[in-house]
A protein has these predicted regions:
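Short helix-coil transition/hinge motifs at the ends and kinks of transmembrane helices
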Residues: 32-40, 179-184, 338-340
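Transmembrane helix-loop junctions in multipass membrane proteins, especially transporters and channels
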Residues: 32-35, 68-72, 117-120, 142-146, ...
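Alpha-helical bundle regulatory/interaction domains
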Residues: 110, 145-273, 303, 343-353, ...
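N-terminal low-complexity or simple alpha-helical regulatory segments
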Residues: 1-135, 151-152
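Membrane-proximal linker segments that couple transmembrane helices to downstream signaling/catalytic modules
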Residues: 235-352, 358, 363-366, 373-383
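The cytoplasmic-loop to transmembrane-helix boundary for the fourth helix
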Residues: 47, 114-140, 144, 154-157, ...
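Structural signal for membrane-spanning alpha-helices in multi-pass inner-membrane proteins
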Residues: 24-27, 63, 137-141, 208-209, ...
């Protein structure tokens, strides 16, 4: 090593390599969930994440081999160098490694992030096609090594990463609305963590493709951030609940099958009475993990018609069910106060159908405009 800085970089580089290798082997070999035993993550997501970690690990290996080859030509390198210019040979190695990184990293990281959105399958071929100009610009750089085409290749990759980020954020935003339209309980289904993953991924990709080879400090930053990023990615994969057996999972259609025509007004007007009888009066809303599809089957209507009804009412399915649950909580609270029964807000929230108190607290504040504690104090003076 030439300096302490080189030693530190090799340590970070080796740490990132081992972190990606361990994460890959964990996802491939361990069937259980070590992070959240009660959560079953999507198998497709685990496979995409394992592929991403494998590509990251292999990428670290081939860049390391290229580094040592450029520093110390082995016997094969010497023989080849007798025919070709050594500098040109190194540029070929850089091109191959860069293009492999581009195709492998962008494809697998995009596949992983899209697999977190379980409303439908999204094609990856546009991402693969988008990497082709990068390879072409690198080939032109080999033919005309004046730096122009290399700068264009870098600028193209940075722009591609920005556009990919915009697309992923839009897809996540649509998925968030789809969840609210189809599920009452969003615990282990929420996508706030996915937004964080998208932006961190964008930052690392832009730093990696745009600046790492030009500034040594950027190389340190990328390797330093890669280790916690791999851990965060693995945690996100293992804490995302699979939606199998529910509406819209693993289908090629962007949304659940829809009738060619909208529901007749008479049908929509009758849905209100069906909901009153089968959901509100029967207190079906107390059932945890009640989905739009399950509710539509119970009341005997098409789930698309039911979705249309909620849209007509200016509601989402999530808001409708949680509204009923909050009203149930309020009734339980007043009964408990009137009978002087001991209780906790957490207990009443659970009896009202909420799986977690944090979900209840957020829904309550959004609907009532106050925190649970403040509302109880203002209502009866009891906290």
């Amino acid at each position: 090593m030439n300096s302490v800085g080189d030693l530190l970089f090799i340590m970070l580089y080796g740490g990132a390599t081992m972190a990606s290798l361990i994460a890959c082997l964990y996802l491939l070999l361990r069937k259980g969930n070590a992070f959240a035993p009660d959560v079953t993550p999507p198998l497709t997501l685990r496979r995409w994440a394992a592929a991403f970690f494998a590509v990251s690990c292999l990428g670290h290996f081939w860049w390391l081999l290229l580094y040592f080859y450029s520093r110390h030509l082995n016997m094969i390198g010497v023989m080849v160098a007798s025919v070709l210019d050594t500098r040109h040979l190194n540029m070929i190695g850089l091109m191959v490694a860069s293009v492999l990184d581009c195709v492998g990293m962008l494809t697998t990281i995009t596949g992983t992030l899209l697999a977190m959105l379980q409303d439908r399958k999204r094609p990856l071929w546009p991402v693969v096609i988008a990497t082709m100009p990068y390879a072409v610009l690198w080939a032109l750089h080999l033919a005309y090594p004046d730096g122009l085409f290399l700068d264009l290749a870098i600028a193209y990759m940075v722009l591609s990463c920005v556009l990919l980020t915009v697309y992923l954020v839009f897809a996540a935003w649509r998925y968030r609305h789809w969840l609210c339209d189809n599920y009452a309980d969003l615990e282990h289904k929420e996508i706030r963590s996915s937004y964080i993953m998208i932006f961190i991924t964008a930052l690392l990709l832009i730093l990696f493709f745009g600046f790492e080879g030009r500034y040594k400090v950027i190389s340190f930053i990328v390797q330093f951030l890669s280790i916690p990023f791999f851990g965060l990615m693995l945690w996100r994969v293992e804490t995302l609940q699979q939606l199998d057996g529910m509406t819209g999972v693993d289908t090629e259609d962007p949304l659940p099958a829809e009738p060619e025509e909208t529901a007749p007004l008479a049908t929509l007007s009758g849905i209100g009475a069906l909901l009153k009888r089968h959901c509100e009066d029967a207190q079906l809303y107390l059932k945890q993990d009640l989905s739009l599809s399950q509710l539509s089957q119970t009341i005997g209507t098409n789930h698309y018609y039911l979705s249309q009804y909620f849209t007509q009412q200016g509601l989402t399915y999530n808001a409708y069910i949680n509204g009923l649950r909050i009203n149930h909580f309020i009734n339980l609270y007043h009964e408990a106060v009137a009978t002087q029964r001991s209780f906790t807000a957490q207990q009443l929230a659970s009896e009202s159908g909420f799986r977690s108190y944090s979900t209840f607290s957020a829904a309550f504040k959004q609907r009532i405009g106050q925190t649970v504690t403040a509302w109880m104090r203002d209502t009866t003076g009891v906290e």
